[in-house]
Amino acid sequence: MKRTITVLLSLLVCSAAMLLAQDSSSKPSDAAEMRQEIDQLKKMVADLQARLDAQDKAKAQQQEQQAQQPAQPTTAAAQAAAAQADLTTSVQDLERRMLKSERDAALSKVRFSGDYRFEAHSIWGNVPNFYDGMQLQNLMVKTLFATAPTSQGGLGMPFDPNIMSQYTPQQYAGMLNQLVNHNYGTYQAYTNQLTFNNLKQAVGSMPPQQVSALMNYLQGATYVPGYKDDTNILYTNRFRLKLDSKLADNLSVTARLSMYKAWGDSTGVQVFDGQPNSLSIDGNTVGTPNSDILRVERAFFTWSKIGNTGLYLSIGRRPSTSGPPMNYREDEPRGGTPSGALIDFQFDGITAGYRINDRTELRACYGVGYQSGFGNGDILELPQDRLKNTHFLGGNFDIYNSEKTFLQLTIARAFDVTDGFNGLTVMTNNPLTGDVIGAPVVMRYTPSANLGAINLIGVNFSHSFGPVDAFISGNYSGLRPNGITTPFGGLGSDPFETPTNHDGGMVYVGVRYNLPQNDGRTKFGFEFNHGSKYWFNFAQAQDDIIAPKTNTRGNVYETYITHRIKSRFILKLDYLKYLYNYSGSGWHIGAPKSLDAAPILGFPTYDRASMLSLGMTTRF
């Protein structure tokens, strides 16, 4: 029994220690109540000890009687047992309450917030007349197969230039297809060992005039008349959960989980149609409709006030999406660090910054866009054949940031850029041979070459003039190729061209009127952006269903109305109109083609498109 008392006293002491160590964020009323209960328990233990002492004395006087007859529980013993049971129950209840208090205190250190958004879209698109570049490449490969020596896997048939005057392009294409069908095994063996370098060498061995004449001739068999591409209705769900935890005065952790999907589709993989948002890559998994999987959009720690200065360090999956001025049309605060007109792209990296004062902040940023040494079969390649990592290095300078005025400079350079990024997609054609893939399957796309560097510079300025918010964004891009091309092309060039430097630009302006009659709950906005022929930015995660609007090589007009039905319940009506001047918007590879005349396109593209959207967003 005394051992039980000792255990109970130990529990009582531990409970008291736990209370004293309780986080300062616990409610004062809970702590006071528990202290009162501990005092009561102390008194109960003292009373129980007195009863046990009396019981021991009674036992000593009755030892002879207990030796002569079976032991019977005394009244004192029964009372002591009852008291022990009551005390044990009280201590257990106290432990449960203290554990709950500790749990509540821990949860109070993590702040949860987020939003859910429903949208309904109607899309109208127009594809202009074009020549199918994938089919053209396929006819070229089949011609090379027919004329290649048998020692190289071909059929060894001489090429007669006069054939171009004897048959129409369609007839010649039919003859080639029939020839391949009759020699399909040989053709498969030929294409299985074919590389892009082999293809370039074969084309390069032909007289330039003959290549040009053959391409022009074959082109006639690949013409596709323009057509409409409309989607009457498309529904989407987006859910985002944000977690913030302050671990110390100068240390915090932030994360955001996101789910974004189209109704009726959770595959997470799209059929590749030539648009930059149809390839699921590390940079856009939550910026375009994907699946019902909750993905980590951002997760990083921030160590601030290092050495009691304005210096800070932040490492992790960066807040690099929805940066200014993209937040105006969503009626929400700044969502990301870099300019959204230049970079709207998820990536992992490091930021070292210095807060000069309350209005001025300087940041140096580093990130990785492609990691060659993991998951890409490096060990299967000789060292000289392995790709280099794609690194991002940049600076972000918030020159002046106040409640009404914002001025920002963003500079970035991407080193050793590859022909795309690791991703998942469903390819309908082999990009090397142009052959149709009979049973399209989900495949991992892995880059094949480093193509050069890309430079980006952007300046954002915004100001509030009473009920009117306005912004202007000026941006520059520079493609700096290293001379290498792939089946998709080089930096700003087609596969069989020699890449050269190209510069591009984009201007983006917007104005928003906050209706003063209802305290700005209703907002009317208009935005316009224009991109030049060789304009490129990293905006694959930009949340525009058709395509990221700031990618556009041409003009985009957007007008919208947002209305806060409640402070955290927002209704939005939006209309977007795209007018494309050149192909390849959103791509750093391939030469832009004017859409005024029927161009050769690897994949169909819009010359104009529009979208009407209705959305409802709840925030918590």
What is each stretch, according to the model?
Residues K109, Y227-F374, T390, G394-L409, ...:
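Outer membrane beta-barrel
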Residues L20-D230, K242, F620:
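N-terminal periplasmic/intermembrane-space "pro-region" immediately following the signal or transit peptide
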Residues L8-A16:
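Bacterial N-terminal signal peptides
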Residues P225-K228, L409-F620:
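Outer-membrane beta-barrel pore domains
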Residues E102-G133, L139, L243-M259, W263, ...:
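Hydrophobic, aliphatic-enriched repeat segments that assemble into extended interaction scaffolds
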Residues P73-T75, P128-Y223, S266-T285, T337-S339, ...:
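Solvent-exposed loop segments that connect transmembrane elements
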Residues M1-L8:
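Bacterial N-terminal signal peptides that target proteins for export
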